[in-house]
């Protein structure tokens, strides 16, 4: 087994999964030099951040702004030591995970189905962003946060919490963001957040499938394969002319992939709501989950900003009741 720990986020990487991998790899290597963590675990392998796919324009912008290279792509973990950030589900992790050695998991989602034969470093907190958890690990273990790392951690929080508008946002996320902003030299969090999110609103050069897959995850919902994607926009008018094209691509994806349903969240950051595009064999799950009957291709969900907290749980419950 290689003497390297590959720190990796989920498939279809977003800003939090990429930047958290970079920041946690940096932190791990600081732990390797000594300090409090050595009292708990022996660290011999050097950490290296990797990603499972191409970065989106928002992440690319953040990395360039704070002087980081895009990490290498690694999709198979067989025979490798890996640390998982921003996920703990097999469907979202590297191939060959059962033949990898998982040495750490740092996350903010529900606990997934990745298991280990021995105890590991496992930190999972109910906050809005994995970057928030990593910042706390820096503090708890007495490692100073450099300006560039502070910048990407802050960007991750603003991205994942949708500038603190997402239902997943906690007061701790806001406090941590303020502390990181001071280190990174960012004065106006809202302005910087809009600057970041605007990069994801550029969809003209994307294919319909690119839009669906930009921030997309597969789920097993009571034995049924369900996909939920999300694209965040500063204005839904930017994508209105593409709806029919996207819908047809979703139908094709559903048929070819054996899905019970594919749901695409078109989230309007400024209006604070989501137009949910739906292709499913079970249209009744929409009413069960959200209290609104599906008429046509989509349904508007006022105040819905978070896939993790406001879309996936009610869908899981609805599919379980079929």
UniProtKB/Swiss-Prot annotation:
Q: Where in the cell is it found?
A: Cytoplasm
Q: Does the keyword Manganese apply?
A: yes
What this protein needs as a cofactor is:
Mn(2+)
Q: What class of enzyme is it?
A: hydrolase
Location (main, coarse): cytoplasm
Q: Does the keyword Protein transport apply?
A: no
- Which Pfam families does its entry note? DHH (PF01368), DHHA2 (PF02833)
This protein's GO cellular component annotations are:
cytoplasm
Cofactor binding annotation: Binds 2 manganese ions per subunit.
**Binding residues for Mn(2+) 1:** 10, 14, 86
Q: Which reaction does it catalyse?
A: diphosphate + H2O = 2 phosphate + H(+)
EC number(s) of the enzyme? 3.6.1.1
Molecular functions per Gene Ontology:
inorganic diphosphate phosphatase activity; manganese ion binding
Keywords noted in UniProt: Cytoplasm, Hydrolase, Manganese, Metal-binding
Family listed: Belongs to the PPase class C family.
Q: What is this protein called?
A: Probable manganese-dependent inorganic pyrophosphatase
Q: Which organism is it from?
A: Archaeoglobus fulgidus (strain ATCC 49558 / DSM 4304 / JCM 9628 / NBRC 100126 / VC-16)
